[in-house]
Amino acid sequence: MTTQPSLLSQVEAGVAWITLNRTAQRNALDIPTLKNLHALLDAFNADPAVRVVVLTGSGRSFCAGADLAEWAEAEARGALETYGWTETAHALMTRLHSLDKPTIAAINGTAVGAGLVTV
């Protein structure tokens, strides 16, 4: 079984494209995806060749919000209090909304919960 990266990115003509790529989960945000997205935003913000950042989703959904399966696993381990999703998501949303470059949410389908907050 091969795994797909949770994010795809490319830069074309000054436009940085970031695609949420967890199609089977409707692009739900788990902690690794949140952290990787934050790192990509930092890199694109620092890149002088990038003039604008576009965030979109693969498949039929833009983003289903939090990955509730990951939340359930943390709760089953008794680790929900230290799980850190809310803090990690808040840091990402703050970064997304404070970029020095214009950002565009290319909403290609459902945007729910934290997926809607990215807009």
Would you name each region that the model predicts?
Residues N21, A66, N108:
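Histidine-centered beta-alpha loop that forms part of the nucleotide-sugar donor binding/catalytic region
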Residues G57-R95, A111:
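Glycine- (often His-adjacent) and acidic-residue-rich active-site loop
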Residues M93-V119:
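Glycine-rich beta-to-alpha active-site loop
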Residues I18, L55, D67, T118-V119:
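Hydrophobic/aromatic residues within transmembrane alpha-helices
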Residues M1-S58, L80, T94:
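Conserved CoA-thioester-binding segment of acyl-CoA-metabolizing enzymes
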Residues A28, C63, A114:
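Residues that form or flank phosphate/diphosphate-binding pockets in enzymes
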